[in-house]
Amino acid sequence: VTLKPLDGLPDELHWLDEVAREHSVGGALRLSLPIRSTSGKLIVDGWTAFPYLAGEHQPGRWLELAKIAREFAPLFAEAKRPDFVDMRNHAWARADRFAWGVDDGGPPVAAPHVADLVSARRQVLDPPGIIHGDLTGNVLFDSSHPPAVIDLTVYWRPAEYSVAVIAVDAVCFEGAPRAE
């Protein structure tokens, strides 16, 4: 069992327990979903529990991560847009809403090149759905088991967006060459 402090909204945890569990049955991926306490609670004194899943993060497996992103999204093809995606107020959620033009409050941080990036935005026509917004460091590989997806970070975006995040993470955090 892996214990961690609740770092999101309780609604997210309940969604993982109910909706994600229902939609992930029989999938080709192992998903780390919350474990209830002996009293049936998902949160106990601010802490949550998740199963230990065998495997390890292996930098450089970006093409496999892209394949996993493309396998993850269809698991939830029938799932409705979770209400909690609009209620989150952490920096990643604010940046996501700003990047997609759904938050008119201005950039979440003052950073160089934001205006250039905003002017480069284009309309995306691909349909949105459930994606994992941070797969790069959250997939465990094990030769005896299917890939394990941990720390599920759910967003309502087109599936290929999660692949784009993997590409950017690969270059920025794992030393991938820009041309790969």
Model-inferred region functions:
Residues G129-D134:
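Conserved catalytic-loop position in the HRD/HxD motif
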Residues A20, G55-H90, P112-L125:
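Conserved kinase catalytic-core helix
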Residues D142-E180:
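Active-site Asp-x-Gly
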Residues K4-D45, G55-L75:
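A conserved alpha-helical element in kinase catalytic cores
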Residues V85-G105:
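Alpha-helical scaffold segments that mediate packing/assembly in large oligomeric complexes
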Residues T136-D142:
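Conserved protein-kinase catalytic-loop segment immediately C-terminal to the catalytic Asp
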